[in-house]
Amino acid sequence: MNAHDTAPVPPPGCPAHGSGARVPLYGPEFAADPQAYYEYLRHYGAAAPVELAPGVEATLVTDYAAALQLLQDSGSFRKDARRWRAFNEGKVGPDSPVAPLLAYRPNCMFADGADHIRLRQAVTDSMARVDTRRLSRSTEQISGYLISQFGGRGSADLLGDYAKQLPLFVFNELFGCPADIGDRVLFGISGMFDGVNAEKATSVLFQAVGELVALKRAKPGEDVTSWLMRHEARLSDEEMVHQLALLLGAGAEPLRNLIGNTLHRLLTHERYAREGGLIDEALDDTLWENPPMSNYAPHYPAADTELAGQQLQAGDLVLVSFAAANTGPALKASRQAGSNRAHLAWSAGPHACPSKEPARHITVSAIEHLFNELPDVELAVPEDSLTWRPGPFNRALATLPARFTPVRSGQRTVPQQGTGSTGQDSRPAPERPAERGGMWSQFLNWLTR
């Protein structure tokens, strides 16, 4: 008798019913109840066969210990996506909906060995220079601006109007984007992840980041872009563009969903309100149970190997389910007895998130400021009417409608910048008529009113 003979029934709506096929991690059924899918996948053992999109096969690690083994074994499991056998054999094309997040790019996420160490150290050292006071000031300024745009209405979509925009604005400030370049960075990243004309959005983003690199070569400032440029790793312009695109894109999407998922938890679980709105605790619980990047960390075996009893061939695509690993039955007792931050939401090993402390700080500050400004904010629709965006990687709500007592809209007193990193010291970048006067420009104008 093999594992399939005793397998439980797949979740309702799962196309794997009776077919023996790989379990699909896309579509509304998976988005509506991913934990039911993870429970089913655990029957296979520590790893299971899944499909990320039609025709895109992968092995998904669902066990905490096996996930740690993979993430920490950089000798046996590599990150360079040029090893991806199915892609090299033409079974997965560059037009696949999952290709943008899996295909190789010359950045530290897809690098191994000495290249990874050099690129990663440059990123880590540059991000470590971000002062928490500056981060708090920037988050508060941007939070105040965003709330001023919808506060008078008495209702808002806390995702589209707030959580989705705030990380991009904060990153624009930290990376020293002047008005025109910042507008196009916002346009590019939003389009890439929202799937609206993603090809154009990607082109706009990389062109804007390329101009930012040229700008900072000519006139560096006190910002992450300039620090990365001056690092002893001596990154080339091409390397600079790809590291910045990674930090901006891969940082903004999970962070906006972390803010959104934590807000969702605070607004739908009464115990946080009873206990004084413990934002830090709600954040940790979200990272354990509803992490914004639920299934990711693509790896490729360097040679035919075995992982927790599963046979893998060289070049197979292997992902880690942070959501499944964090919520495994064996972890329940140890989670209560041990650290509340031993989850895998930030990944682990040499490719763990280099920006987890800034991400925590931005999330807590953004939610604290929102609750201070809108103390009676509450969910505007029944919780069971909320929908989650389909897709194999992210755990993200489509919308988060809220209502509150309207607050007076107007110019708020904001702290002075003190760094000049938003572009006041920069030469003007070439304008793009389609994005002229965009969101970043409007925020900078609001700051100086």
Regions found by a protein language model. Give the residues of each.
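Cytochrome P450
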Residues: 1-449
